[in-house]
């Protein structure tokens, strides 16, 4: 099942301009590297390390200060990575006869404007920390609300007109 899912996800990435990926199926990061296109980490919760507050899995625990808060995010990154790396490695070995380029935990590699992170949380629930880099955007929650008066910006319309419709793979 996991190998088939990796195949489906990788196939869906073919011919795209960029890959927006959920932290669970992190194959999106490696597919983008293989295809030479940008990747965008779309996290439903804060994943970028900060000293301001601990990682989600430690959030209700005793607060130990900035360094400990930062460390909890690195621990969480590794837990997420450990849970998902084997199917990626297996697929890549079968497909390419080698592991992905720079195979390792991808979350901390979204470190530039070319590799941004978007977080779908409210600044009122998880305030944007001062120590997050500029390429991390706390966008607020993503809803499928119908706004009949909304108009897409011209640059977005031009982008969409240049190619096939975007495809989202996730949940």
Question: Where are the predicted features?
Answer:
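Nucleotide-sugar-dependent glycosyltransferase catalytic domains
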Residues: 1-166, 171
């Amino acid at each position: 099942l996991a190998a088939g899912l990796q195949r489906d996800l990788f196939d869906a990435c073919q011919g795209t301009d960029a890959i927006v990926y959920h932290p669970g199926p992190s194959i999106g990061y490696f597919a983008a590297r293989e295809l030479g296109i940008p990747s965008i980490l779309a996290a439903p919760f804060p994943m970028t390390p900060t000293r301001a507050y601990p990682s989600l899995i430690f959030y209700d625990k005793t607060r130990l200060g900035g360094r400990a808060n930062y460390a909890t995010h690195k621990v969480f990154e590794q837990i997420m990575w450990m849970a998902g790396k084997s199917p990626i490695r297996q697929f890549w070995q079968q497909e390419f006869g080698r592991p992905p380029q720079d195979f390792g935990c991808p979350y901390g590699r979204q470190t530039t404007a070319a590799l941004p992170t978007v977080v779908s949380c409210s600044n009122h629930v998880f305030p944007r920390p001062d120590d997050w880099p500029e390429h991390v955007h706390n966008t607020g929650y993503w809803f499928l609300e119908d706004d009949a008066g909304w108009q897409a910006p011209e640059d977005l319309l031009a982008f969409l007109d240049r190619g096939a419709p975007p495809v989202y793979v996730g949940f």
